Swiss-Prot record:
It comes from Apis mellifera. The keyword Aminoacyl-tRNA synthetase does not apply. This is Hexamerin 70c. The gene is Hex70c. It comes from the Eukaryota. GO terms for molecular function: nutrient reservoir activity.
Length: 686
């Protein structure tokens, strides 16, 4: 029972709490408002440590950590941190930070532990202000953000979106340069006057606009791979449960981690495949460590210190300086395959641990990610991190301050590289093999007696390209903090969107009962006509779109569901300038300030693949299962708040092969749908 509930928790974390019920929004009191403003201010213009008019500046400059040792839960954490700092051993302020480097991982964990161990909010704030002035900005941003998520006294508090903190990770260097030019040519009057807020728009394109000579078909998907909110979503999903954090120490249910790692990437890869279909690209190419990599990586995004991200040409072989990792990666792959086929992992004491148990998937996920909860990191290594290092093609530097990480070594840029999808297709193949070796579902597990789908009708499905603006103030340097608040620089880009639609479902029931409706979207292939055979072959290519509880009455039941109600998704994150204005008005007493326990989900506007102008066929799969309210459980996870979940596993019933049965399943329903893309030349400026 526990494992089933946990699987749902993992899905909830991925997509916004599938089938979960949330507490409502809250109205902030004055204590919450002042804390929220302090947190937000610390991440504005985070690369500048010279903003002497900011509140945190004097706080951080005057704070003496050694004199306040009693204000931390664990003095050893403070002593260790200060020793490292005094020895000058931390990453330099202008170096490039990546949590996937072993030295930098150790350092960001020390900074996080320092912030987390502060006994009260004031000590936490003073410590953060001190670190804001002295530590590497990327390391500070990561450690501080995670501390805010996990500290009880900062629960539900928001920070600027990562694309607003580091716009250079999301927009090409030409955009950053134009923003800086605008600031130099027009921003000075804003800073000195500070009477009016002035907004400037910088138009931007996707990578394919600047690289047609490379003719790489993978970049037909640049509007998806480089989507700002999608990349931010992935960043937060990985940062929410850092691989270096021990779940037993930080109120992070241990049984979540492995499933979350798997389900996050399963959902993303399925959604990516559906987008490939809209562009006639077929399945993602497989790769071999000993052969050239098909896809290149071409981008002009750059790090904050002006260094461009390492590139990779099409069909390029592994560089010689990565050869030393080949034996290691091949050994790790062999050990993973042996574990799946034999049915057991080997822990650090040499004991065999059965993985074909309710806890097995979680253990396998931890091992592949190489998280702190892996049962044997020494033997199974950190496959995910090592594979990213090899595929990134970046140079190996002995000095951490000279390191230039690849796009794959930053969670906020990983999805821009086509190799990301090749890598995770390979990783998911291990999980798929594991799933295929599990027993098929029985009739009693699948059927819902007395319940039958009568019909399903759906509005016509349309996608289009809209204009999206992103605040990029952090791309420029400002003379002072207050003046920076009166300048609004925004990058405008075409972004895919969809027209909201309604599901109209008719179900017949012979009794009053409660159930859970699951809706999936998958590809439509013509070679297989029988639905059961189709699911047997392509079950793993379906993405779960929605999930909600229903109460059925005897007889015919009509159910209407809006696409925007999906708990998997969230609408566009409120821009920082609007959020900050609302926050200040609330502090001034002119209007109330409300906040939600749920702050993140998959971008709603990307819930549908693009389709085609003439329409493209996909398949929707509807499944209704019984729900026992006595088997529900509640959990609370950073960014997602409190969730109440049922007892079915993630992706049920498409989490494993669906064999052709000798019985009927009236509580499932297939429907062909067509997705139409409305061309918009004005918005599609790429």
């Amino acid at each position: 029972m526990l494992s089933k509930v946990v699987l749902l928790v993992a899905l909830a974390a991925i997509c916004g709490a599938q089938g979960a019920s949330y507490a409502g929004r809250h109205t902030a009191d004055m204590d919450f408002l002042h804390k929220q403003k302090k947190i937000f201010d610390l991440l504005l213009y985070v690369r500048q440590a010279d903003l002497s008019d900011a509140e945190w500046y004097d706080v951080g400059r005057n704070y003496d950590m050694e004199s306040n040792m009693d204000m931390y839960k664990d003095k050893n954490v403070v002593q260790k941190f200060l020793w490292w700092y005094k020895q000058g051993m931390f990453l330099s302020r202008n170096a490039i930070f990546t949590p996937l480097n072993s030295e930098q991982k150790y350092e960001v964990r020390m900074l996080f532990e320092l912030l987390y161990n502060a006994k009260d909010f004031q000590t936490f704030y003073k410590t953060a202000a001190w670190a804001r002035l002295r530590m590497n900005s990327g390391m500070f941003t990561t450690a501080f953000s995670i501390a805010v998520l996990y500290r009880p006294d900062t629960k539900y508090m928001k920070f600027p979106a990562i694309y607003e903190i580091y716009p250079n990770y999301f927009f090409d260097s030409s955009v950053i340069e134009e923003a800086q030019n605008l600031k130099m040519s027009r921003g000075s009057s804003v800073v000195t006057g500070m009477n009016n807020i002035e907004t400037y728009i910088v138009n931007t394109n996707y990578s394919s606009k600047n690289m047609r000579e490379y003719n790489d078909p993978e970049y037909k998907l640049d509007y998806f791979m480089e989507d700002v909110e999608l990349n931010a979503y992935y960043y937060y999903m990985r940062e929410m449960l850092p691989y270096w954090m021990s779940s037993s120490q930080y109120h992070m249910p241990k049984e979540i981690r492995g499933q979350l790692y798997y389900f996050l990437h399963k959902q993303l890869m399925t959604r990516y495949f559906l987008e490939r279909m809209s562009n006639d690209l077929g399945k993602t190419a497989e790769f071999d460590w000993n052969k050239p990599i098909n896809s290149g990586f071409y981008s002009t995004i750059m790090y904050s210190n002006g260094v461009t991200f390492p590139q990779r040409n099409r069909f390029s072989s592994l560089p010689y300086y990565k050869y030393k990792y080949l034996n290691v990666i091949n050994a790790l792959e062999m050990r993973l395959m042996d574990a799946i086929d034999s049915g057991y992992l080997i822990d650090e004491y040499g004991k065999k641990i059965d993985i074909y148990t309710p806890e097995g998937l979680n253990m396998l996920g931890n091992v592949i990610e190489g998280s702190s909860d892996s049962i044997n990191t020494k033997f199974y290594g950190m496959y995910d991190i090592l594979a990213r290092d090899i595929l990134g093609y970046n140079f190996d530097f002995q000095n951490k301050n000279n390191l230039i990480p690849s796009a794959l070594q930053s969670y906020s840029t990983s999805m821009r590289d086509p190799a990301f999808y090749m890598l995770y297709q390979n990783i998911l193949s291990y999980f798929l093999r594991y799933k295929k070796l599990q027993p098929q579902y029985s009739q009693s597990e699948l059927q819902m007696p007395g319940v039958k789908f009568e019909s399903v009708n759906i509005d016509k499905l349309y996608t289009y390209f809209d204009k999206c603006d992103t605040l990029i103030n952090n791309a420029v340097a400002v003379e002072n903090f207050k003046g920076g608040m009166y300048l609004r620089l925004k990058a405008r880009r075409a972004c895919m969107n969809y027209e909201r639609f309604t599901y109209k479902i008719n179900i017949n029931s012979d009794k009053e009962t409660k159930g859970m409706m699951r809706i999936f979207l998958g590809p439509a292939f013509d070679e297989i006509k029988h639905d059961m055979v189709y699911l047997q072959k392509y079950f793993y290519l379906f993405m779960e779109m929605d999930r909600f509880a229903v109460t059925l009455r005897p007889g015919s039941n009509s159910i209407e569901r809006q696409s925007s109600e999906s708990p998997f998704t969230t609408s566009t994150i409120m821009p920082s300038d609007i959020f900050y204005d609302k926050l200040n008005k609330a502090i001034g007493g002119s209007e109330p300030f409300t906040y939600s326990e749920k702050m993140l989900g998959f971008p709603e506007r990307l819930i549908l693949p693009r389709g085609k102008p003439e329409g493209m066929r996909y398949k929707m799969f509807f499944f209704l299962s019984s729900m026992d309210e006595s088997n529900t459980k509640s959990y609370e996870i950073p960014l997602y708040g409190k969730m109440t979940l049922d007892d079915k596993v993630f992706g049920f019933p498409l989490d494993r092969p669906m064999w052709a049965w000798n019985f009927t399943i009236p509580n499932m329903y297939f429907k062909d749908v067509f997705i139409y893309n409305r061309p918009n030349e004005e918005s599609m400026n790429y």
